Design a protein with these regions (language model features):
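A residue-level marker of the well-folded mature domains of exported/periplasmic proteins
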Residues: 1-178
Length: 178
C-alpha cells in the first residue's frame, strides 16, 4: 500500500473547459473577420505557443481549436513548443513566427507575455489577436487582446484549507463553473 500523509493532497483544474470557451471567442472573431471581408475562409488560421508536448497542453489546444471550429468549422491551427514554461524571448519569437505564417489569432499555454507582446507589436495589414492564459493581457496588448482563461483556485483552496483546519477529508472531486 502507498504511504499516506494526512497533510498531502494533489489537485488540478480542468482548464481545457476554459480553453474551449476561449476558442469559441476566437472563432467568433475569425467569423467576424471573414464576414467583414478582412480575411477569406482559407485564412482562418490560429497559432498556439505551447510549453511542452504533454497531455495538459495537448488537451488544452485541442479544446481551443474545437471551440474555434464550433464557430468556423474550417479553422486550422499550428502549434510551436518552447520546451519551457517561462521563456519570454522564445515565446515571443514563436508567436512572431506564427504571425509570419499568417496566423490571425495567437494563443498560448506558457507563462509570459511574449505572445501578447508579439501580437501587439505586429504591423501587418491584417490584425492579429491574442488569447491569453492565466492572466489578462489587456494592459500589454490593449488593441489585440480578445480574452483569456485561467483557473480560479480560491474556492478550492478555501475548501481544502478549511478541511485541514477542521480535521476533515479534502474532497477528491470538486466541480466549479467555467
Amino acid at each position: 500500500e502507498e504511504p499516506y500523509l494526512k497533510n498531502y493532497h494533489t489537485f488540478m483544474g480542468a482548464i481545457y473547459q476554459g480553453r474551449y470557451a476561449a476558442g469559441v471567442a476566437a472563432g467568433m472573431k475569425l467569423k467576424e473577420l471573414i464576414d467583414d471581408g478582412i480575411i477569406s475562409e482559407s485564412e482562418a488560421k490560429i497559432g498556439y505557443v505551447g510549453a511542452y508536448p504533454y497531455a495538459e497542453v495537448i488537451s488544452g489546444y485541442t479544446a481551443f481549436l474545437l471551440g474555434a471550429r464550433s464557430v468556423v468549422p474550417h479553422a486550422v491551427m499550428t502549434v510551436k513548443y518552447t520546451n519551457s514554461w517561462n521563456d519570454y524571448r522564445t515565446e515571443k519569437k514563436y508567436a512572431r513566427e506564427l504571425i509570419d505564417e499568417h496566423c490571425i489569432i495567437i494563443s498560448q499555454h506558457s507563462d509570459t507575455a511574449g505572445p501578447a507582446t508579439a501580437c501587439e507589436e505586429t504591423s501587418s495589414d491584417v490584425p492579429v489577436y491574442n488569447v491569453s492564459y492565466n492572466q489578462s493581457m489587456l494592459d500589454i496588448a490593449p488593441t489585440t487582446y480578445l480574452t483569456g482563461c485561467k483557473i480560479n483556485w480560491k474556492p478550492y483552496m478555501k475548501s481544502a484549507i478549511d478541511a485541514v483546519l477542521n480535521d476533515k477529508v479534502i474532497e477528491k472531486h470538486v466541480k466549479g463553473n467555467v
